[in-house]
Each structure stands twice: as structure tokens, then as C-alpha cells.
Design a protein with these regions (language model features):
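A short alpha-helical cap/connector motif
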Residues: 1-70, 74-98, 102-222
Length: 222
């Protein structure tokens, strides 16, 4: 069975005619091998993908821009946040970043370091990054599938630059201390939707873009 995250990523690639895809954390290529992109780069220090290196080392030498980036590497909050910040600097305007494991099923799945037992899924503290991203006040949803799939779309060219200047950097100290129980308390206030709802929104947006490109709709029309 093809994972939902694969279907969502392929939908984005097809819907917006994206070509360049980056995956951080490939493991056994369950996702990577099923992604239908013209150009794919997969980064993992142990197995899978196309490059055997850490994401930090990759971003130090990378010169490419990407349309879609999927972050599913180290599941410690500070590393996920660093991967997100670095990804922003190599994401094209209008591009999309997907993040995995933002809705752990219980507090036992939401800890880091990951336990050495067979407890699955192993979400770590990835979920805390949602609060950093929400602080940006940009387009961001959490899809209620698998263990929570975050979807951030960059519509703002001014978000780029040195990661230390991003608004989210000011929230890092706060978000890293948020307990899992607190997240559960405010869960109903989070932008959590179903995948089909997000896909419908993206379809409407793409139609609008095409009408604007053809001069059939003003850019400020709503």
C-alpha cells in the first residue's frame, strides 16, 4: 500500500508542475522510490536516497533550489527546526515543505531520544516544530493522516535569508519546552485538516493561477 504522504507529495508535484524534489531522511526508500519527480535528491547518513551524508552537511554544500522538500530525518525538535530553516533557503517561491510525525498518537511516541524498544511509530519531538512554523503566520496546515503531516507553502519571497533572522527563531526557546499534554489541550485550535480538504484548496488555487496567467482574472480578485 502506498503511504498517504507519498500520494500527497505526488499530488503537489503534479498539480503545480513541480520538477525538483528533495527528501531529508530516506531510510529504506519507502517514500523516495515512489515519488514521481523529474529530479530527485535524497539525503540520509545511513541508507536510502542518493547522498550518504547528514542534512547539515548537505545544506552546507548544496547549490540547488527545490519545489518540494520532505523532512523526515532526525526526529529531535532542534534538528527538525534546523532542517526546516535550511530548507527555506533552498525552496522556490510557491514551493512546498512537507514534515512528518507532527501528531504522535501518545506521549510515549513523542519523546527523544527514541526508545530502543519496538514501539512504533517513533515520532520523537518533531511535533514541537509546528509551533515554530505557526509563529511565521504563513500558509501552514497539519494533515490528519499517518502520524500528522505538516504542509508549509512558501508564498512570500521575503522569508528567505539567514535562518537566524527568521521570525520563528525567536520562538525556539519557548517551543522546545512545550509538554505533549499541552499540545493535546490546544489541539482543537491547531490548523488540522484532512488531506482531501488540502488537495481541494490546492486545486482551486491552481485554477486561479491559470486564470491569472491567461489574463482572465485580476491578481487581486477574490
Amino acid at each position: 500500500m502506498i503511504p498517504t504522504r507519498v500520494k500527497l507529495i505526488n499530488f503537489a508535484l503534479n498539480q503545480f508542475k513541480f520538477k525538483d524534489y528533495l527528501e531529508i531522511g530516506c531510510a529504506y526508500n519507502e517514500c523516495f522510490d515512489n515519488i514521481k519527480a523529474e529530479h530527485k535528491v535524497g539525503v540520509d547518513p545511513k541508507c536510502g536516497g542518493t547522498l550518504r551524508m547528514t542534512s547539515d552537511d548537505f545544506f552546507k554544500v548544496n547549490l540547488e533550489k527545490f519545489d518540494v522538500i520532505f523532512i523526515d530525518g532526525d526526529h529531535e525538535h532542534k534538528q527538525v527546526l534546523r532542517d526546516f530553516k535550511n530548507s527555506l533557503m533552498f525552496l522556490r517561491k510557491g514551493g512546498i515543505i512537507f514534515l512528518h510525525d507532527l501528531l504522535p498518537p501518545s506521549k510515549h511516541h513523542a519523546i527523544y531520544p527514541l526508545p530502543d524498544n519496538e514501539l512504533r511509530p517513533r515520532c520523537g519531538t518533531s511535533w514541537r516544530v509546528m509551533f515554530d512554523i505557526l509563529a511565521l503566520k504563513r500558509e501552514f496546515f497539519i494533515l490528519k493522516h499517518e502520524t500528522g503531516i505538516g504542509v508549509f507553502r512558501n508564498q512570500d519571497p521575503y522569508i528567505f535569508g539567514d535562518g537566524s533572522t527568521l521570525p520563528l527563531s525567536r520562538t525556539e526557546e519557548d517551543s522546545k519546552n512545550i509538554p505533549f499534554d499541552k499540545m493535546l489541550q490546544i489541539k482543537s485550535e491547531l490548523p488540522i485538516i484532512r488531506g482531501h480538504q488540502w488537495m481541494e484548496m490546492m486545486t482551486r488555487d491552481r485554477i486561479r493561477q491559470r486564470l491569472i496567467e491567461r489574463g482572465m482574472l485580476d491578481d487581486d480578485y477574490f
